[in-house]
Each structure stands twice: as C-alpha cells, then as structure tokens.
C-alpha cells in the first residue's frame, strides 16, 4: 500500500506553485513512497545505547560578535535597484 497518494503529491506541487504532468506526479509518488518507507525502517534501529546528538559531526561554529556596521548611503543602493520609490526598492509581486 502506498504511504502517499498521487492527489497529495499534486496538492503539494500546487502549494509550491509547481506545474507537474500526470507522469511526473506518478513518478514523484513512487519516489516519495520509497523515501517514506526508508524513514520508517529507521524507526526500527535500536538506539538505546546511542547518546543523543544535535549534529552529525563534533564540530562547533565559532562565531564573531554580531556588531552593526556602517551601511551604504541610500543613494548608492538605489543606483543598483532597477525600480525604487520613496527610498524603498520595489520588486514584482509574487503572491496572488
């Protein structure tokens, strides 16, 4: 039995604003079902003696202090913006 339906794949594609064909929807359904099946297999792994970790490697990020620096003058920034108004950069609308 499939763990994900073709309708669910089409719905997620629609939410992501992706146009997919019927053939692609079937292919993605099979691929996602395989991924979900593998993830379910991981639930069967005995991890009783495994210490919980937050990262795969024991590396830590060394961060610098987050200090605000001097920015560019607005006029210089607007020179690089293709469309601007009243000190704001205008971009095309992406939401319906």
Curated annotation (Swiss-Prot):
The gene is gatC. The keyword Metal-binding does not apply. It holds the Pfam family GatC. It is an enzyme of class 6 (ligase). Signal peptide: none annotated. One of its GO terms (molecular function) is ATP binding. Its EC number is 6.3.5.-. Heterotrimer of A, B and C subunits. NCBIfam families: gatC. Keywords: ATP-binding, Ligase, Nucleotide-binding, Protein biosynthesis. The keyword Aminoacyl-tRNA synthetase does not apply. It comes from the Bacteria. This is Glutamyl-tRNA(Gln) amidotransferase subunit C. Belongs to the GatC family.
């Amino acid at each position: 039995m499939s763990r994900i339906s073709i309708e669910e794949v089409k719905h997620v594609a629609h939410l992501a604003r992706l146009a997919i064909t019927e053939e692609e929807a079937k292919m993605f359904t099979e691929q996602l079902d395989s991924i979900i099946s593998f993830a379910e297999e991981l639930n069967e792994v005995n991890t009783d003696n495994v210490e919980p970790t937050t990262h795969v490697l024991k590396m830590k990020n060394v961060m610098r202090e987050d200090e605000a620096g001097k920015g560019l003058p607005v006029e210089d920034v607007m020179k690089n913006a293709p469309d601007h108004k009243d000190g704001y950069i205008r971009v095309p609308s992406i939401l319906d």
